[in-house]
Amino acid sequence: SQLDYHDCHEAFDKKLKQYKKHGYLIPNHKMIKNEKQIEAIKRAAVVNNGLLDYIEEHIQIGMTTQDIDDMAVAYTSSHGGYSADLNYEGYPKSICTSVNDEVCHGIPGDYVLQDGDIINVDATTGVNGYFADASRMFMLGHVSEEAQRLVKVTKECLEEGMKAVKPWESTIADIGTAIEKHAHANGYSVVEEFCGHGIGKAMHEDPYVYHYTPKEKTVLIVPGMVFTIEPMINQGTRHIHLGTDNDWTVYTDDGKLSAQWEHTLLV
């Protein structure tokens, strides 16, 4: 009933205030989604995850990255969704396809997928004004053991970050600490320039989700928050640069491999 909802809401706000008194940085109301918003985000996530499943079934050596983008457009539109990436701040395509030493924002084009490549496909899908965001790594043909290990450890970094999410107990910083610890233990570095983010009615919302231990205080994690965790893990140096071919694609400074896995998470 409306009364139960009001009581529940009031108790939640009271609990937040208590945590604030104890020195915690608490999330604002925009960061906490209601049931209706959560259901809408879930609908977008079903299409977005379905798209990545579809790509997993069809991606192959000899295909261009543009072919993957074409697949994404066809799948998303036929399932009642649309790409949030297309025309976002002028981005020209519907997904990002980042190959080998490309860290993120690889633009689909005429690059032909080769035996031994690793590729990240990152998709953000909108359905009725709500969004979900995820990315996966795909390995093509005979991939080196070093590349396989990077892909595996990067996925584990995402999983460690997710395990650190404990409502009313952990803060956003705990996610970054868990990711960084696992990456460093395996001899890898964490890209610091790009982070996860809140998501819902916009593709990028607060909070900013670090993949390393930040210096500043971060918000308490509470039920109803929806955000992405999307670590980019490098084989060599963490340092990166924008390529000269476009205003989007980012590369590792040393030309070594980079990998990323991403989930949208509901607390």
Predicted regions and their residues:
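Short Cys/His-based metal-binding microdomains
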Residues: S1-K20
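Active-site neighborhoods and metal-handling regions in enzymes and metal-associated proteins
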Residues: H22-V267
